Amino acid sequence: MAKKSMIARDVKRKKMVERFAAKRSALMEAFANAADPMERLEIHRKIQQLPRNSAPTRMRNRCWATGKPRGVYRDFGLCRNQLRERAHKGLLPGVVKSSW
């Protein structure tokens, strides 16, 4: 189980990313389309003034059951341990053991 503070930090980051997504994407698009170097510099400064945690890069995929940050399968949102455990119990529809 991950520390509660780390899970809370990621939840906070997720909310902040959602809050600033429109503004950040508009600035990034303007930055890509700007031809004048001074205009690009000004837009870059505006992007830098946004909160650091509003960047989607800073979010971390975590297991929704345990909060573990590593070995998380995107399709299920579960870490490898929980995925294996739940698949053996038959709690994941469509998941079967492979045999060849």
Swiss-Prot record:
It comes from the Bacteria. The keyword Ribonucleoprotein applies. Disulfide bonds: none annotated. GO terms for cellular component: cytoplasm; small ribosomal subunit. One of its GO terms (biological process) is translation. PROSITE patterns: RIBOSOMAL_S14 (PS00527). Pfam families: Ribosomal_S14. GO terms for molecular function: rRNA binding; structural constituent of ribosome. Keywords: Ribonucleoprotein, Ribosomal protein, RNA-binding, rRNA-binding. Part of the 30S ribosomal subunit. Contacts proteins S3 and S10. Belongs to the universal ribosomal protein uS14 family. Binds 16S rRNA, required for the assembly of 30S particles and may also be responsible for determining the conformation of the 16S rRNA at the A site. This is Small ribosomal subunit protein uS14.
